[in-house]
Structure formats: C-alpha cells, structure tokens
UniProtKB/Swiss-Prot annotation:
List of residues binding heme c 1: C82, C85, H86
Protein name: Cytochrome bc1 complex cytochrome c subunit
GO cellular component, one term: plasma membrane
Gene3D superfamilies given in the database record: Cytochrome c-like domain
Annotated InterPro entries: bc1_cytC-su, Cyt_c-like_dom, Cyt_c-like_dom_sf, Cytochrome_c_Oxidase_Subunit
Length: 289
C-alpha cells in the first residue's frame, strides 16, 4: 500500500513537470517557426531587391509622336517612289533594284541627296543629278529604311541636324596620305575622278559635301568599296574628308591647275603653247627676212 501511494504521488508530481516541458517544447517550436518565417521573408526581400537593382531595364522602343509621323511620311514616300524597284518589304526586285535591308539611312542619304535615286533609267552607273526630295523628305525616307532594315546611320550634330563642318578632320597630312593610299587610284589625287572599266567611272568629288563623302565610305555605293571602322577609323575618315574639301576649296599655290587632272592635260597645254610660240616666232623671223 505504501508503494502504491508513493507511485500515485510520484505520478501526480511528474504530471505538472511534463506539462511544463511540453509547453516549453511548444514555445521553442513556435519560436523556431517564427524565426524561419522571418528569415524567409528577409531572404525574399533581399533577393527581390537585388533582382530589381541588377536586372537591366528592357530596351523597349517607344516612338513618340514626332518619330511616328516621320516614319509614316517615310513610308508614304517610299511607297510612291521606291517600292516598284526595291519591294514592299525592302527585299529588292530582281533586275530592278537591290535589297535595302541593312543599308541604313546612310545609304539613303548618299543616294537620294546626290540625286542618284530614284534612278531615271538603268545604266552601267547612275550619275549625279539634282535631288528631287528636300532634306526633311530625305530624313523621313532614311528613318523608315533604318527602322525596318537597320544599317549605318548618318552622323548628326547634338541638335539632331545632319553633321557637315564638324566632319572635317584637322590632320590634313594624315588625310592626304590615307586618300592617296585608298582613294586616289580611282578618284585622282585631287579628287577629280577617273574612268573605270565597262562604262563605269569614279565621280568627281567636287560637288560632294562632307556627309556625302562620309556616307559613301560607310556604304560603298555602286563600284566603291566599303570602309569599315576596322579599315579606317571614324577619325581617319574625318581627316580624309578634311583633306578632300581643302584641296577642292583652296586656291592652288602652283597657279591654274587645268582641272587638276594631272600631267596629261598639263603636258598637252605645254605642247600647244610651245608649238604656237615656235610657229609665231618662225613667221616673225621670216617676215623680217
């Protein structure tokens, strides 16, 4: 009986302890769950913040009203003047016109501002003539081609206007060396142009402005090769432009250049002047005798 009473009293004493231990375990489990939830919340917050900071902003092209109007105008001009030869999707038309995909607004500026496009007829080489589009129309067509086909762009001033005077490099000696190395074999050392094979020719650079010379080097129109930045850097192109415009515009220190075509016309002029002088002198001597 005593043992039984002792056992019952022990059980009664142990029950509060068990309840207290169970309560402590419950509190520990609750604290663990709260701490785990808090850590998870902190981790999600930090990872979300890092993702927001480090993820690059998507490059979404959003055209404003002005650019949209420019593209609409360009498409209208293209559809009325260019689509019959170059195709509705710029893919080109066999035996009529090449693809315009990848030529960029630089090619549009050169071809249209020099009057070569639209072409009046098919021939070995399209000659320069007065342009039929004004500057704003050329910009619109160029913007449409650039938006749909991509390619080299026109160099512009900070205000968005087409760059001209700023394209003239200052190292004219370097520009002259580069011109003689890369261009003079076709365009003559003074930029007067020259004949090529199959009815083709290198045109006179005299009427070309700075932007037209640059875009010609970027796009390689007709028989001209392209000059990528790996061949001629942008600064090298500017020096060539500066040299060409200086040679064309400045007075020749040697006197009248006879068109700048080189020794052939100069030799012919010397021969004619010499023969006329000799004949005149002979007649004068004969008359005195």
């Amino acid at each position: 009986m005593k043992k039984l009473g002792f056992t019952r009293s022990s059980r009664r004493c142990s029950q509060p302890q068990e309840r207290e231990q169970e309560s402590e375990r419950s509190r520990r489990r609750l604290r663990r769950r709260l701490s785990e939830g808090l850590l998870l919340l902190v981790a999600l917050t930090v990872s979300g913040g890092l993702a927001a900071v480090l993820t690059p902003t998507p490059q979404v092209a959003v055209a404003d009203e002005d650019s949209s109007a420019l593209l609409r105008t360009g498409k209208q001009l293209f559809d009325t003047s260019c689509v019959s030869c170059h195709g509705a999707n710029l893919q080109g038309v066999p035996d009529h016109g090449p693809s315009l995909i990848g030529v960029g607004e630089a090619a549009v500026y050169f071809q249209v501002s020099t009057g070569r496009m639209p072409a009046m007829r098919g021939e070995a080489q399209v000659a320069r003539k007065d342009p039929i589009f004004n500057e704003s129309q050329i910009d619109a067509i160029g913007a449409y081609i650039q938006a749909n086909g991509g390619g080299p762009t026109v160099a512009r001033n900070p205000d968005g206007s087409v760059a001209m005077q700023s394209l003239r490099g200052t190292d004219l000696g370097r520009g002259g060396d580069l011109f003689r190395l890369n261009c003079a074999s076709c365009h003559n050392f003074t930029g007067k142009g020259g004949a090529l094979s199959s009815g083709k020719y290198a045109p006179d650079l005299g009427p070309a402005n700075e932007q037209q010379i640059l875009t010609a080097m970027l796009t390689g129109p007709q028989n001209m090769p392209k000059f990528a930045d790996r061949q001629l850097s942008f600064e090298a192109k500017k020096d060539i432009i500066g040299y060409v415009r200086t040679v064309i515009e400045e007075r020749q220190p040697g006197g009248y250049s006879l068109g700048g075509f080189g020794p052939a016309p100069e030799g012919m002029a010397i021969w004619i002047i010499g023969m006329v002088t000799a004949i005149g002198l002979a007649l004068w001597i004969g008359a005195r005798a």
